[in-house]
């Protein structure tokens, strides 16, 4: 009897994980079930299955408290018998992308340093639509909702351009850029006013680093 019950439990678990396999890369809402020294356990969906948030998927600016509701990015579903696991994240760039996609589906690229700053490039296929304005929302309502969900993380919303040099100039926002010159394959030099140099580089190089990741250029 015990063997039968064990088999039934294993079958139910396998079916549950199989149902979650198509949730990879999606946003889910859950409750924090458990907090230990390293990992965070998050209860997901109606079936109350456990998702695990590893240290590298947590953001330094957030405090995780049992019972809190939060949205997580489903990073990976590993279905391997007793070692089956659903890995979720609050640090993945995909989290910011999915939060905005609930309102604005035209996101081209995202670069992120969790808990500090995100840069997101957007575009619109309709020239009559202000893509940045649609993303920000009336009086900043949409972007503020995402910022609040991310615990105050700064978000730069940038208009994507097919011209890589124009895109680089926009990606260095909030600094103004005088010119961008290509110096090699996927490499360029941006010239900024002297009084904007520190803004273009950012604290500990963060702004320049995020711009490079966003554009794929260095």
Where do the protein language model's features map onto the residues?
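RNA-contacting regions in translation and RNA-metabolism proteins
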Residues: 1-218
């Amino acid at each position: 009897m015990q063997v039968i019950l064990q088999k039934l439990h294993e079958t139910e678990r396998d079916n549950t994980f199989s149902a979650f396999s198509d949730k990879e890369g999606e946003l889910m809402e859950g409750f924090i079930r458990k907090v230990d020294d390293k990992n965070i356990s998050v209860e997901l969906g109606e079936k109350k299955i456990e998702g695990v948030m590893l240290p590298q998927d947590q953001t330094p600016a957030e405090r995780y408290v049992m019972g809190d509701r939060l949205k997580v990015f489903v990073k990976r579903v590993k279905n391997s018998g007793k070692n089956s696991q659903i890995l979720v994240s609050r640090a993945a760039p995909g989290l910011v992308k999915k939060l905005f996609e609930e309102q604005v589906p035209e996101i081209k690229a995202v670069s992120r340093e969790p808990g500090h700053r995100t840069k997101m490039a957007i575009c619109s296929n309709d020239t009559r639509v202000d893509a940045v304005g649609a993303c920000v929302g009336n009086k900043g309502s949409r972007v503020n909702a995402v910022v609040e969900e991310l615990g105050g993380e700064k978000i730069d919303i940038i208009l994507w351009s097919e011209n890589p040099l124009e895109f680089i100039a926009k990606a260095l926002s909030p600094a103004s850029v005088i010119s961008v010159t290509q110096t090699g394959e996927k490499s360029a030099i941006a010239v900024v006013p002297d009084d904007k140099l520190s803004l273009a580089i950012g604290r500990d190089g963060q702004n320049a680093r995020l711009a490079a990741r966003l554009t794929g250029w260095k």
